[in-house]
Amino acid sequence: MKMEEAVGKVEELIESAAPPKASEQETAKEEDGSVELESQVQKDGVADSTVLSSMPCLLMELRRDSSESQLASTESDKPTTGRVYESDSSNHCMLSPSSSGHLADSDTLSSVEENEPSQAETTVEGDTSGVSGATVGRKSRRSRSESETSTMAAKKNRQSSDKQNGRVTKVKGHRSQKHKERIRLLRQKREAAARKKYNLLQDSSTSDSDLTCDSSTSSSDDDDEVSGSSKTITAEIPGRGCFLN
């Protein structure tokens, strides 16, 4: 829009410069006649050619900018980028001093337009960095939750294995009457077996005591018999000695 307005202003300036020249031609006609009219027309043509020769660079640049703006408006899907002007030594319009002053506005506009996409790129990079940080935070949370669940599962497995090894079993649900009767019968059988073992141990201990008593009495009787026989022997020997004497 700015470039189109500039083109309109240039055309208005050219049109405003044309009427005084026409008035000058009319005065020349009144004063000098037809010969002077032809000379004035030639002079006007030369002046117009000089003006146009000094202005073509600006017109070319304005037309180029207007065409580029139209292309940018038609291709709205594509991202806007700054204009890059090629500087060639053969392009006398870009190097001419007359066009340098008029092109200052276009240069500033191009620099502004170049800065805008750079700012947009920086904002996009900031957004991507924020998104990447958010994704990293989510991944860390997921990894923490997964590690916690794995540790909890490992603890449960260890507890269950310890209980199984230690024969610690919990009965789930309500026990039936038959199950209770079976448990009671098993307890009675265990108690009866324990009593039998205790009685057998007591019987074995009593029999051992009886055997020890019998052995002690028999040993005492044997000692008495041995001592009595020895006495008789000793008594008989002196009598024999006396008899021998």
UniProtKB/Swiss-Prot annotation:
Span list, region Disordered: 1-245
Pfam family, one: RNF111_N
Basic residues: bias regions: 169-187
Spans annotated as Required for interaction with CSNK2B: 202-226
Signal peptide start-end: none
Coiled-coil region list: 175-200
Extent of Polar residues compositional bias: 87-132
Function: AMPK substrate important for exercise capacity and skeletal muscle function. Required for normal contraction-induced signaling.
UniProt name for this protein: Protein ARK2N
Organism of provenance: Mus musculus (Mouse)
